[in-house]
Amino acid sequence: MLKIGVFGCGAIGTELCKAIDSGHIEVELYAVYDRHEQSIINLKEQLKNTDPKVLEIVEMVKHVDLVVECASQQAVYDVVPTTLHAKCDVMVISVGAFADKKLLDTTFDIAKEYGCKIYFPSGAIVGLDGLKSASAASIYSVTLTTQKHPRSFEGAPYIVQNNIDLDSIKGKTVLFEGMASEAVKAFPSNVNVAASLSIAGIGFDKTKVKIIANPALTRNIHEITVEGEFGMFTTRVENVPAPSNPKTSYLAALSAISTLKKIADPLQVGT
């Protein structure tokens, strides 16, 4: 049975640990960590059948087969290389960190050197399977349009740097239009999906992103349009926000659970 370490005990990390604890995923939850001690306490209070050790990443990788990063883009810079150097596989939730091409290239090189796997869940979108299939031929364009309630963008670097008053937004308002390379840095907690699209498709500098604040919404909406040699497809998903964090879509947590289940499952279905 795979031994798992979960680094980051926020919304996604907590849902993932609960899924393991309930027996939904047949792996062993060996260790967890979060820089906020209270987050660890809150997580452990929700676990009924397991009592994982609390280990920092350097110790965690000595005992597990797979580390799941659920912390932040900044954490990726330490967690991922440390994990791969220890010859452990890694699942990355904060995929937006890989807009840094140097980090992306270095990470892939380390993984190849040590024979490790890096897993990027689909997150809060649908359509990555189609995009991956389409990438076998030429892709002309990939566009992501994200709509969320204004409060979902609180604290985002782009909002802070531009002194945007989210409370003053009364109608549908475009906050950002640009490339994924800029979007994942401007809204690191909101559009990790742009990173997944970029890596699976035509890259961070060619993937277009539009971010809209809409106070009428109670769900997070992601629309994707892909055009290429194959033709064209559009997907739209309306996500319920995660109960503990409105910046995160519940589907993102479910995607992490599904990815881990697929890793542990001998039967593989789909692209």
Swiss-Prot record:
<dbReference type="Pfam" id="PF03447">
    <property type="entry name" value="NAD_binding_3"/>
</dbReference>
<dbReference type="InterPro" id="IPR002811">
    <property type="entry name" value="Asp_DH"/>
</dbReference>
<keyword id="KW-0662">Pyridine nucleotide biosynthesis</keyword>
<dbReference type="GO" id="GO:0051287">
    <property type="term" value="F:NAD binding"/>
</dbReference>
<dbReference type="GO" id="GO:0033735">
    <property type="term" value="F:aspartate dehydrogenase activity"/>
</dbReference>
<keyword id="KW-0521">NADP</keyword>
<keyword id="KW-0560">Oxidoreductase</keyword>
<comment type="similarity">
    <text>Belongs to the L-aspartate dehydrogenase family.</text>
</comment>
<dbReference type="GO" id="GO:0050661">
    <property type="term" value="F:NADP binding"/>
</dbReference>
<dbReference type="InterPro" id="IPR020626">
    <property type="entry name" value="Asp_DH_prok"/>
</dbReference>
<feature type="active site">
    <location>
        <position position="222"/>
    </location>
</feature>
<dbReference type="GO" id="GO:0009435">
    <property type="term" value="P:NAD biosynthetic process"/>
</dbReference>
<dbReference type="Pfam" id="PF01958">
    <property type="entry name" value="Asp_DH_C"/>
</dbReference>
<dbReference type="InterPro" id="IPR036291">
    <property type="entry name" value="NAD(P)-bd_dom_sf"/>
</dbReference>
<feature type="binding site">
    <location>
        <position position="192"/>
    </location>
    <ligand>
        <name>NAD(+)</name>
    </ligand>
</feature>
<dbReference type="InterPro" id="IPR022487">
    <property type="entry name" value="Asp_DH_arc"/>
</dbReference>
<comment type="pathway">
    <text>Cofactor biosynthesis; NAD(+) biosynthesis; iminoaspartate from L-aspartate (dehydrogenase route): step 1/1.</text>
</comment>
<comment type="function">
    <text>Specifically catalyzes the NAD or NADP-dependent dehydrogenation of L-aspartate to iminoaspartate.</text>
</comment>
<dbReference type="InterPro" id="IPR011182">
    <property type="entry name" value="L-Asp_DH"/>
</dbReference>
<keyword id="KW-0520">NAD</keyword>
<dbReference type="InterPro" id="IPR005106">
    <property type="entry name" value="Asp/hSer_DH_NAD-bd"/>
</dbReference>
<dbReference type="GO" id="GO:0016639">
    <property type="term" value="F:oxidoreductase activity, acting on the CH-NH2 group of donors, NAD or NADP as acceptor"/>
</dbReference>
<protein>
    <recommendedName>
        <fullName>L-aspartate dehydrogenase</fullName>
        <ecNumber>1.4.1.21</ecNumber>
    </recommendedName>
</protein>
<feature type="binding site">
    <location>
        <position position="124"/>
    </location>
    <ligand>
        <name>NAD(+)</name>
    </ligand>
</feature>
